[in-house]
Amino acid sequence: MSQISKEALIEQIKDGIIVSCQALPHEPLYTEAGGVIPLLVKAAEQGGAVGIRANSVRDIKEIKEVTKLPIIGIIKRDYPPQEPFITATMKEVDELAELDIEVIALDCTKRERYDGLEIQEFIRQVKEKYPNQLLMADTSIFEEGLAAVEAGIDFVGTTLSGYTSYSPKVDGPDFELIKKLCDAGVDVIAEGKIYTPEQAKQILEYGVRGIVVGGAITRPKEITERFVAGLK
């Protein structure tokens, strides 16, 4: 695991954009051979990105060969019938911990988990096993963010707002959630449906520690769809 301090990471990502570079098997940029995601990372870094969020052991290993930017790592793996799939069990945490990345992000919603644990207990177990690893909670509502902080999480992400059955469905960032968490003194990494620089600028003014932008930069299919829809 990476030994970077929380303070050092905050300084490194301050006032910048962390770019999420991912492609899942059903998406156009995914290849079995790999090699595509590191190219997105190089483009993001040349464009001024201050960090990268990435999925899977393979992609993260390839990314580390082309950049020294800090990485927020996840492993997306389905565990039906339960809904959580972002670093959903200790198995995924173990795999990520071996990669020497700055932050591991995990699903910290209140939904039923495959391992049967309450989220606070899962966080406790992760921190006990990897006490020096920085952790980010992917959450969907205010209460989940607070619960994660109380359990010892370093950063709270708004990643899953709109993606749980009980969170607001809006076509854009959950400004209200981001601001409420910041006002409560939480170290927030804003993420989710941030489509424009103007939205990112507004979010920065709330006092977030970091901002993750994904689809608006690295998913050309989604970008095209938004333009096509905008012409109708």
UniProtKB/Swiss-Prot annotation:
One matching Pfam family, short form?
NanE
Q: Which Gene3D superfamilies match?
A: Aldolase class I (3.20.20.70)
Q: In which pathway does it act?
A: Amino-sugar metabolism; N-acetylneuraminate degradation; D-fructose 6-phosphate from N-acetylneuraminate: step 3/5
The Gene Ontology biological process terms listed for this entry are:
carbohydrate metabolic process; N-acetylmannosamine catabolic process; N-acetylneuraminate catabolic process
The UniProt keyword set, sorted, is:
Carbohydrate metabolism, Isomerase
Q: Does the keyword Transmembrane apply?
A: no
Q: Which reaction does it catalyse?
A: an N-acyl-D-glucosamine 6-phosphate = an N-acyl-D-mannosamine 6-phosphate
**What is this enzyme's EC?**
5.1.3.9
Q: Which family does it belong to?
A: Belongs to the NanE family.
Output the NCBIfam families linked to this UniProt entry.
Answer: PRK01130.1
Its protein name is: Putative N-acetylmannosamine-6-phosphate 2-epimerase 1
Q: What is the lineage of its organism?
A: Bacteria, Bacillati, Bacillota, Bacilli, Lactobacillales
Q: Which gene encodes it?
A: nanE1
